[in-house]
A protein has these predicted regions:
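Canonical radical SAM enzyme core domain
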Residues: 1-39, 47, 51-58, 66-70, ...
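A generic structural signal for short, solvent-exposed coil/turn residues
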Residues: 11, 39-41, 79, 113, ...
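Short, well-ordered coil/turn segments that N-cap beta-strands
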Residues: 13-17, 41-45, 81-84, 115-117
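Short, surface-exposed linear patches
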Residues: 14, 40-43, 68-74, 108-110, ...
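Short C-terminal domain-edge/linker segments immediately following a structured domain
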Residues: 21-22, 50-53, 76-84, 117-121, ...
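Radical SAM enzyme [4Fe-4S]-AdoMet core and its adjacent flexible, acidic
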Residues: 50-52, 57-170, 180, 217
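Accessory C-terminal segments flanking Radical SAM cores
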Residues: 129-239
Length: 239
């Protein structure tokens, strides 16, 4: 959207904003304007930058040729303008390898000027291309009334948010391609109950609000925005 920078500047006058991006097309003039807008606002501007591997060999087969190098350039640019992007990666490796993979992410990010990286790991959603690559949801992978009886449904994004698009207002960003996720043409029309019956709802239930900004609780990442330390800072920034 050619008006996105202006939209974000306006948004910051009224509340916080988060940009979900692959980081490959960021421009200095955009970030300079957004930096100024955030500095003048009482609210924060977050960037969530999707990278699904710590190298071209691991990322590009998923996101496309050349995307890793362009994304890393985007990370460096964001850090240059004082933003601390949440690096978001879908776990396409064995869970037992988390520490090793996070350590490799950290090494690469530090090499691009991001000294205290914030990393958010997402579970694999068995929809879209992933359904063809591995498998779809199994018959038993659905939510039941019993599972929800003592569950705080505020942890589910659909309980308090909606997604506004040029095709209508949807219940959540994950189900945006599902016809039943379109709840109307306005926010008021969309404020109706939604039956959480999709397989993706099961994953969201398992892992909490996977679309929110909290970064990984792993010791290799930090959940609080901090200023990048200079090159002389200690190297063990694991908390």
């Amino acid at each position: 959207n050619p008006e996105m920078v202006d939209i974000l500047c306006w948004t910051l006058q009224h509340g916080p904003a988060t940009v979900l991006t692959n980081g490959t097309v960021l421009k200095e003039e955009w970030l300079a304007k957004l930096q100024e807008a955030e500095q003048q606002s009482r609210y924060s501007l977050e960037f969530r930058l999707s990278i699904d591997g710590f190298s071209s060999e691991t990322n590009d087969p998923i996101r496309g040729d050349g995307t890793f190098d362009r994304a890393m350039a985007g990370v460096s640019l964001l850090c240059e303008f004082g933003f601390l992007p949440i690096i978001t990666a879908t776990r396409v490796w064995d869970e037992e390898s988390d520490l090793e993979v996070l350590a490799q992410f950290k090494t690469v990010l530090k090499a691009h000027g991001y000294w205290r990286p914030r990393i958010k790991l997402l579970p694999t959603l068995q929809i879209g291309a992933e359904e063809n690559r591995t498998r779809g949801y199994l018959q038993h992978e659905v939510l039941t009334d019993t599972m929800l009886s003592d569950f705080d449904q505020h942890n589910l994004v659909c309980s308090h948010s909606r997604i506004v698009t040029d095709r209508g207002v949807h219940v959540c960003p994950i189900l945006i391609e599902s016809p039943d996720s379109n709840l109307g043409q306005s926010i008021s029309e969309s404020l109706v109950p939604f039956e959480i019956k999709h397989g993706a709802c099961y994953t969201c239930y398992q892992y909490g609000s996977i679309c929110t900004n909290a970064s990984s609780g792993n010791t290799l990442s930090t959940t609080e925005p901090t200023v990048n330390p200079p090159d002389t800072a200690r190297e063990d920034g694991d908390t």
